[in-house]
Amino acid sequence: MNPEAMADVHTQGAFSMVELLLAADPVVKAVLIALVIASIWSWAVVTEKFFAIGGARKKAKEFEEAFWNGRADEYELRPGQSSNNAGAKLFAAISREWRDAKSVSPSEHAALVARAERSLRATVDREVGNVSNGIGALATIGSSSVYIGLFGTVWGIMNAFLNISAQEDTSLAVVGGPIAEALFATGLGLIAAIPAVIFYNKFSGDLNRYADMLDAFSQDLLVRLSRRASDGPI
């Protein structure tokens, strides 16, 4: 930062973070803008995933309850459906095997269950992948924002020493601006990184529980399918 510009800010008695950003060194300014964008991006991802993961788990649970209560026919279960209910998609993935289970011969029993298992596994992976799409940005922001802020800090401190050398003066008017820039970059880096790391860990746990729930329902479907193929209608 130009020391004269910083002095003008102080003399006007209207110092603020916005004015600090506008008067900052171009490199530090680029760092601060990048961190602001990263922070906004991370909160956008957090908001979207908060509703997406919660909604997906709720809908899958609703279908599972309907299935065990004998109301699965309330859902459209044809393969290739556009439903956003993961539970319904799991059942749709084995709907053909479910229909054929009543008439399958004993020699085809194992093959039918194996086909269903592969289809369910692929569907679970696809559904978890769809819901988790985007949370990698939180990991990137959480791991990189601190270092980006640190770069701005180093640059601001370097400018402070350069100003001391150029002005041959160690007064606050000379070093205050660059030091303020350095501290602001550090703080903004932490502001961007900390929420990103916290919510990345939270969503990772939520996704693991979501995947476990779908896996458990898949295994229940396989058991019911196997019994249906062996014993006829349940």
Annotate each PLM feature:
Residues 25, 43, 75-76, 91, ...:
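Residue-level signature of catalytic and energy-coupling elements of molecular machines
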Residues 24-70, 74-76:
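Transmembrane alpha-helix/interfacial motif
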Residues 18-31, 132-138:
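Membrane-interface helix-boundary signature
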